[in-house]
Amino acid sequence: LALECFRIPHFYRAFYVYKYATGLSAAIALSQRVLTGGADELADYLGFLQGGCSEDPLDLLRNAGVDMEQPQAVDTALAHFGHLVDQLDDLL
């Protein structure tokens, strides 16, 4: 039991949890583009999916309209989270 913490990769793998946050930020930014955009944004998203592993993930995301090297994707995710918190607050 004393070494139980070594079984959980969240504690010892560099950037393990960071991957969740960046993936979620990218997904929210992509979905917001599709839901609020038009045919071009949908085509960008489908192109992202069709890209598979053909390019670097950052390049695929950038081509789909989400630049993970800029703060907008994280800002979009934080705004979405804030909206969800407001909805929860209204329910409570």
Predicted feature locations:
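C-terminal, non-catalytic "cap/extension" segments appended to globular domains
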Residues: L1-L92
